[in-house]
């Protein structure tokens, strides 16, 4: 990932994270039968330092997964989700980051983690067009915002 966009260390939200991330990726899809599909995409993120803040986010292992069954030629139902685990500490000025929460100091390097699982529906129509909706409930969340993920995609091919 390349740090594009505007960055200001004084702002809470920015369009850039102001550091490079090297992220090797591995993915595969297995079709054990004509109607079933199992897919996995795994990455490992090596984050570089943000030189404006002397902050370096920890390394992150992450994977997305899905399993689906083709009910009809136009309808697939399944499960989907993701897992994320930060494997090294966040550091600032070379020191492990410590935060205070609920009146106690948390000395875990702000290592984030989350697991999510939920249903998925994929519908094909008009020969090659498709619509997909996925929802996932997050569990076992640490050191990151917690919530549910809702993802919708509409694909309509066209010719030039």
Please report, for each region that a protein language model flagged, where it lies by residue:
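Outer-membrane pore/translocation modules
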Residues: 1-51, 104-112, 159
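Outer membrane beta-barrel transmembrane domains
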Residues: 54-160
């Amino acid at each position: 990932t390349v740090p594009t966009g505007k960055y200001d260390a004084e702002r809470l939200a920015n369009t850039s994270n102001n550091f490079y991330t090297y992220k090797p990726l591995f993915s595969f899809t297995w079709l054990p039968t004509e109607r079933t599909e199992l897919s996995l995409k795994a990455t490992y993120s090596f984050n570089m330092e943000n030189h404006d803040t002397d902050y370096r986010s920890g390394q992150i292992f992450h994977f997305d997964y899905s399993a689906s069954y083709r009910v009809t030629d136009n309808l697939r139902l399944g499960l989907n989700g993701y897992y994320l685990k930060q494997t090294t500490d966040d550091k600032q000025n070379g020191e492990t980051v410590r935060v205070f929460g609920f009146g106690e100091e948390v000395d875990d390097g702000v290592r984030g983690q989350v697991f999510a699982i939920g249903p998925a529906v994929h519908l094909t129509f008009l020969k090659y067009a498709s619509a997909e909706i996925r929802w996932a409930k997050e569990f076992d969340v640490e050191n990151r915002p917690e919530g549910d993920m809702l993802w919708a995609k509409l694909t309509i091919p066209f010719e030039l």
